[in-house]
Structures are given as structure tokens and as C-alpha cells.
Amino acid sequence: MKKLFLAITVTIFALCAHAQEYVEPVEKWKAAEVWGINYHGWSFHQDWEVDFTVESQDGRFTPTDEEIAETEGLIQKRIDYINQDHYNQEGMCPIIDEHMRMYRRQYVGFTNDRGDHIVWVNFLWDDNLSNEKLASDILLTKGGCGHFWHIKCNLATRKVYGLEVNESGDIQYLPRVKKPAPRISRSKDRNKKQKVRKTGIIHSPEEKLFK
């Protein structure tokens, strides 16, 4: 009888210990929301997977509020000159430099082989897009002309370059080709710190290179 009681006690203790170590996955990471003069957007963490690279890419970084403010200042100062050809902005399509306040942004940080910080900025003008959607993942699009565009800014050289404006046509939100964003796991013991399951970055020939 004592042996049976001891066996039951050991089993219960083992089950309790296992339950304490159980990690319960919860909601996805959300990008950090940022506001400034004439801009509103979301900064994505350096471990967030993306479907593209930049030239001479060597790594990733998370754009800070200060870096985003600097990026926006450079873009807003120079976009009028960079966009002087008004490519894909004919007819009913908006001239992008005349409507900068209308776009919500997504910011992704890259480093190149010289250690420069390059911020890729995605501009989206779609009143049907919720802020929740914009914070949940990076959105690549096709169509929509001047309502959707992206550009890069090298903070070391202060160069703004690589403007790409969507072609005309119905807007399409392109499916993601990579894994979901990193997820936060929370232990049932609320006194423990949250654990982050990092997915890392996959580089393959199929990744799109924005020049």
C-alpha cells in the first residue's frame, strides 16, 4: 500500500513539474507604431522575415524612432526631385509627392557590407486597410499605381534611391512566400520573462531584389 501511495505521489509531482514547464504560444509580434511630422507607420523588428533583400545586404536592424524621423526627413525633402518623371502616376493616379500625408508606412531595416543602415519604406494608400493589418505583416502589392510605392534611404550616405511605383490596374495583395513572423511564447508561470522564438532570415535565389 505504501509503495502504491509513493508511486502515485511521484506521478503527480512529475505531472505538476511538466505543467509548470509548458510554454503556451500566444499572439504574433506586432510591429512598433510610430508617428511624426506628416507620417504614420510601423517599424518591423530585425528578426521579422521578409520576401526581399537589398543590394550588398549583410544583415538586418530594427529602425529606431530617431532613424525613422531622419529617414522621413530625407525622403520628404527629396521626393519631389526623385519623382519628377511621375512614373505610373498618370490620369486618375495620384502624384505621390503631392499626397505624402495620405500614405501609411512600413519600415524595414537592412545593413550592407559596409555597415550602412538602409531603411526600406513601404507606402500604402488604401482606406480599406486596417491599422491592425498594417501592423501584422509587411504587405507587398501589385497594381494600384500611385497609391502604392516603396523607396530606400541609406542613413550613412543620406542617399534616397530605388523609387518603385506600382503599375496601373486593380490592387492585389501578394501572398507571403516565407514563414509567419516571430511568435512570442509565454510560460504559464507569469513571473517568468516572455520567450521569443526567432525565425531568422532565409536568403535564397528566389528572393526579390529591389534595386
Question: Residue ranges of each PLM-predicted region?
Answer:
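Generic short amphipathic/hydrophobic targeting helices enriched at N-termini
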Residues: L6-I8, K192, K198
